[in-house]
Regions:
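Catalytic nucleophile serine of serine hydrolases
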Residues: 153-155
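Extended, subdomain-level signal for the structured scaffold at the beginning of enzyme domains
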Residues: 11, 16-145, 157-249
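Conserved, well-structured core segments that form or line functional sites
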Residues: 146-150
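Bacterial N-terminal signal peptides
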Residues: 1-10
Length: 249
């Protein structure tokens, strides 16, 4: 009997070890906690489609997603359109609606659990992503561990101050895109946002790429994946998935 229990115990441990080796690491979505467009008083937050469309791609591929925001808790939402079926699917998914409504604070995140960090857009990101040292440290660790750093639209505001162990900025020398100066001008917020994202990324050494207004444009370079605008959100999710498959996370 003792021998049988020992054999069963060894078998269970081996099975669990084998299972753990094949478990996919999670993906961390970052959303803003900021709810106003500067002095305008207009509401903002994370842009729903820039969460839902990448989420759909990665969720259906079997990846578990967690949410973090600078302040934790329920983040403000912008671009709330449930006529978009993907937005509706995300919003009505009880598990993930609960997750985003109870987003973690950066101090609650263990970077080792994640293969990817993705910064969702929405104008609020321009106020609370760039200077958040805790989020930058999380992203740097994920990247240094061989992971992916991604963002869409204003989300790459979170990339501008990420430094690597060698002291260089993450975006230095890499092809990057994000919400463009022309798009910021088109929505008449050039003088409202605290900085122009395109300019700041260039200052950090990024090789900034862009297409015309509201065109889908995604670039992947050395495990950094960025998209230009809301129209690029799904494609960013697809590019992340492709990179994850290449890395076998």
């Amino acid at each position: 009997m003792l021998l049988m229990l020992t054999v069963l115990s060894i078998g269970f441990v081996q099975a669990q070890t084998k299972k753990s080796k094949h478990m996919k690491k999670k993906i961390l979505f970052v959303v803003t906690s900021h709810d106003k467009k500067g002095s305008t008083g207009e509401d903002t937050g994370y842009y729903l489609g820039e969460v839902s469309h990448p989420w759909e791609v990665l969720y259906k591929a079997g990846y578990e997603i967690d949410f973090v925001s600078p302040k934790g808790g329920t983040p403000p939402v912008d671009g709330f359109d449930l006529k978009d079926p993907v937005n509706k699917e995300f919003w009505e998914n009880k598990e993930y609606k609960n997750k985003i409504d109870h987003s973690m604070t950066p101090s609650q995140v263990d970077p080792k659990e994640y293969s990817t960090i993705f910064y969702a857009g929405g104008h609020g990101a321009m106020w609370d992503f760039a200077d958040n040292k805790e989020l930058a440290a999380i992203a740097s660790e994920i990247y240094e561990n061989g992971g992916i750093v991604a963002g869409v639209c204003h989300g790459p505001a979170g990339l501008v101050n990420i430094r690597l162990n060698n002291g260089k900025y993450l975006v230095d020398g890499k092809k990057i895109n994000a919400f463009t100066n022309e798009e910021e001008s088109e929505v008449k917020l050039t003088n409202v946002v605290p900085f122009l994202l395109e300019n700041r990324l260039k200052e950090r050494g990024a090789q900034f790429e862009k297409s015309g207004l509201w065109q889908n444009h995604v670039v992947a370079d050395q495990r950094v994946i960025t998209g230009q605008n809301p129209q690029s959100a799904k494609s960013v999710g697809e590019a992340i998935l492709k990179e994850l498959h290449n890395k076998s996370f």
